[in-house]
């Protein structure tokens, strides 16, 4: 026997022998449908539209497909209808997923309803055209959204007399709205019907109160706007930071330092005195224009008559100022007949050279020192006013004052007010509009002058009253703020604290520079004592040389110090605590001996106590 091939099984269907028996009949049906396709195209289109449903129907039995009627016409139609069914069934065997139709009203799906046995029997006795029409209607009804909603929720309001319930709800809502409207309208009508004079008065009073509140609010906004506009102007008038905080940036030791503007004024006086001395020794007429050009070349700063007035305020006996004319200037802008400010230095009778006054270099140095002392005395006056304004007030003699109060801001001291310089004599010439107006002022009648004077007095009084009110308000706010901050604290305790603080500040202000340096060294001693003990413990020796001790302590100390400074600190430590650290000079070397049996905490307490005693002196 020959071996069977795989292709021999292609003609067999999955249904087994039933499909093999009907093989001949299938071939005949296919041939007949090919002949009838052209004649029954309309019927096949309708069947294809139905067969395009999501689910492929079950395969019909050979009896249904071969149901031949009495006439050949009906048979050809049935064959043409059944052929697309078979082709679609063959296509249904592919790997494409089936789309399940929604379930019907009685729980079964539309597919089951369409192809149930009872429907199959009914379809056998119907013509193809009516069959397609009925199946289409059935599918459309089953696939419509309304049908699905009814299938899912059979107890919707549409099934249970929805019209009655909706009418009842609407009626109840209308009734509630009418009741609420009556409740709202009743009080308004009653109040409108019973309007009395008291009600009108109350309303009028309320309107007046609202009017006053609105006006007060408008005034408040205006004042705030004015303050906001004035604040930038004040900030722009402030000096730059390098001038306001010049005192804090100085490298020198703290003392009676001058503000930045006072230092600039002192430098201006030195430059001016130098130029005046040169011109005076050459017997030249000293004018302000010559001095101005020379000072500006030396300082690279603007020099005006205002600065000359400040110099006159600080040192009034330095120069003699006059207005003179007929001085040759050799300038196009200044005429010989114009008045000019002349400056002449006041020299003592003993300063003579070759029979005439002479301004020597030593005299210039003395004048410079005298000007500096005058500036310092002006700052001391401001400092004295500041001390009296403290609570409690302090009084420190000027000769014992070595530094300013810590809260006294030196760079915010008021500038020196310029003194009046001699002005050129006025000649009766009406050359400007201002002169014409001043001349026409004499034409005003006495009544008009009196009225203008009264108006000026009234405006001045109003301005004074507003200033007094503002000062009183600021004082009251300051007292209330301090009282609220110190609420619950006894007055005697506050006075004692303030007195102690004032005493401490007074001691700081009158302290000598040597004492200040000693206190600074004593503040570093606790840290040095700790490091020194660790060094001796690590070395495991009772005594160490000076060089070794200083090098070890400098290496461990936070602040960098030279060996000479470290030697001074150790000498001070041995002076304060001789029983703990002792110095022993042996031949050419110096040894430090430390008593390691003493407690370090006791040593630190003794150092702190000694520091407090030194500060209180």
Swiss-Prot record:
Which modifications occur after translation, per UniProt? Ubiquitinated by the DCX(DTL) complex, also named CRL4(CDT2) complex, in response to DNA damage, leading to its degradation. Ubiquitination by the DCX(DTL) complex is necessary to ensure proper cell cycle regulation and is pcna-dependent: interacts with pcna via its PIP-box, while the presence of the containing the 'K+4' motif in the PIP box, recruit the DCX(DTL) complex, leading to its degradation. The interaction with GMNN protects it against ubiquitination.
Extract one GO BP annotation from the record.
Answer: regulation of DNA-templated DNA replication initiation
Q: What residues form the membrane-spanning segments? A: none
Keyword annotations for this protein, in alphabetical order, are: Cell cycle, DNA replication, Nucleus, Proto-oncogene, Ubl conjugation
Short sequence motif named PIP-box K+4 motif, residue ranges? 1-25
Source organism (scientific name):
Xenopus laevis (African clawed frog)
Q: Which CDD domains match?
A: Cdt1_c, Cdt1_m
Q: What is known of its domains?
A: The PIP-box K+4 motif mediates both the interaction with pcna and the recruitment of the DCX(DTL) complex: while the PIP-box interacts with pcna, the presence of the K+4 submotif, recruits the DCX(DTL) complex, leading to its ubiquitination.
Quaternary data? Interacts with pcna.
By sequence similarity, the record places it as follows:
Belongs to the Cdt1 family.
Q: Where in the cell is it found?
A: Nucleus
Please identify the protein, giving its name as recorded: DNA replication factor Cdt1
Q: Where is the composition biased (Polar residues)?
A: 1-22
Q: Map out region (Disordered) in residue numbers.
A: 1-27, 51-111, 462-483
Query: What does the function comment of this entry state?
Result: DNA replication licensing factor, required for pre-replication complex assembly. Cooperates with cdc6 to promote the loading of the mini-chromosome maintenance complex onto chromatin to form the pre-replication complex necessary to initiate DNA replication.
Q: InterPro entries per the record?
A: Cdt1, Cdt1_C, Cdt1_C_WH_dom_sf, CDT1_Gemini-bd-like, WH_DNA-bd_sf
Q: What GO molecular-function term can you cite, just one?
A: DNA polymerase binding
Provide a GO CC annotation, any one: nucleus
């Amino acid at each position: 026997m020959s071996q069977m091939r795989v292709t021999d099984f292609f003609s067999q269907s999955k249904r087994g022998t039933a499909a093999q028996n009907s093989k001949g009949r299938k071939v005949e049906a296919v041939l007949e449908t090919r002949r009838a396709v052209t004649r029954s195209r309309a019927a096949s289109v309708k069947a294809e539209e139905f067969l395009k449903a999501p689910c492929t129907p079950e395969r019909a039995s050979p009896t249904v497909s071969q149901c031949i009627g009495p006439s050949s016409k009906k048979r050809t139609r049935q064959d043409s209808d059944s052929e697309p069914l078979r082709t679609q069934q063959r296509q249904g065997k592919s790997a494409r997923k089936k789309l399940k139709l929604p379930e019907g009203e009685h729980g079964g799906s539309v597919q089951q309803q369409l192809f149930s046995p009872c429907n199959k029997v009914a379809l056998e006795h119907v013509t193809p055209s009516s069959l397609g029409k009925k199946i289409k209607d059935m599918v459309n009804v089953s696939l419509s959204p309304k049908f699905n909603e009814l299938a899912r929720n059979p107890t919707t309001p549409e099934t249970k007399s929805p019209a009655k319930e909706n009418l009842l709800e609407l009626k109840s809502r209308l009734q509630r709205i009418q009741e609420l409207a009556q409740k709202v309208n009743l009080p308004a009508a009653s109040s409108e019907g019973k309007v009395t004079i008291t009600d009108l008065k109350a309303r009028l009073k309320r309107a007046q109160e609202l009017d006053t509140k609105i006006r007060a609010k408008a005034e408040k906004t205006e004042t705030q706007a004015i303050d906001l506009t004035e604040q930038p102007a004040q900030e722009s008038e402030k000096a730059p930071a390098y001038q306001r905080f010049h005192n804090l940036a100085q490298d020198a030791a703290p003392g009676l330092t001058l503000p930045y503007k006072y230092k600039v004024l002192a430098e201006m006086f030195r430059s001016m005195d130098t130029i005046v001395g040169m011109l005076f020794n050459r017997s030249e007429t000293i004018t302000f224009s010559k001095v101005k050009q020379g000072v500006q070349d030396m300082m690279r700063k603007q020099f005006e008559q205002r600065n000359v007035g400040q110099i006159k305020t600080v040192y009034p006996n330095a120069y003699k100022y006059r207005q003179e004319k007929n001085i040759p200037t050799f300038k196009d802008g200044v005429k010989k007949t114009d008045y000019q400010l002349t400056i002449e230095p006041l020299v003592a009778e003993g300063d003579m050279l070759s029979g005439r006054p002479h301004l020597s270099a030593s005299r210039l140095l003395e004048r410079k020192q005298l000007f500096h002392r005058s500036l310092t005395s002006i700052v001391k006056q401001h400092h004295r006013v500041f001390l009296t304004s403290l609570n409690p007030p302090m009084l420190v003699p000027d000769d014992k004052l070595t530094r300013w109060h810590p809260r006294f801001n030196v760079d915010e001291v008021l500038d020196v007010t310029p003194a009046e310089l001699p002005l050129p004599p006025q000649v009766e010439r009406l050359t400007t509009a201002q002169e014409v107006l001043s001349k026409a002022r004499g034409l005003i009648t006495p009544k008009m002058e009196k009225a203008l004077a009264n108006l000026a007095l009234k405006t001045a009084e109003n301005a004074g009253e507003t200033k007094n009110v503002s000062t009183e308000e600021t004082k009251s706010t300051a007292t209330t703020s301090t009282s609220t901050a110190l609420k619950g604290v006894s007055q005697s305790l506050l006075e004692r604290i303030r007195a102690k603080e004032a005493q401490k500040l007074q001691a700081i202000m009158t302290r000598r520079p040597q004492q200040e340096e000693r206190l600074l060294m004593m503040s570093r001693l606790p840290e040095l004592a700790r490091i020194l003990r660790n060094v001796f413990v690590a070395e495991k020796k009772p005594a160490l040389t000076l060089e070794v001790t200083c090098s070890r302590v400098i290496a461990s100390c936070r602040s960098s110090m030279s060996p000479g400074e470290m030697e001074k600190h150790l000498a001070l430590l041995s002076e304060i605590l001789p029983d703990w650290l002792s110095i022993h000079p042996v031949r050419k070397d110096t040894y430090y001996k430390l008593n390691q049996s003493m407690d370090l905490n006791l040593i630190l307490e003794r150092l702190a106590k000694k520091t407090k005693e030194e500060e209180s002196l």
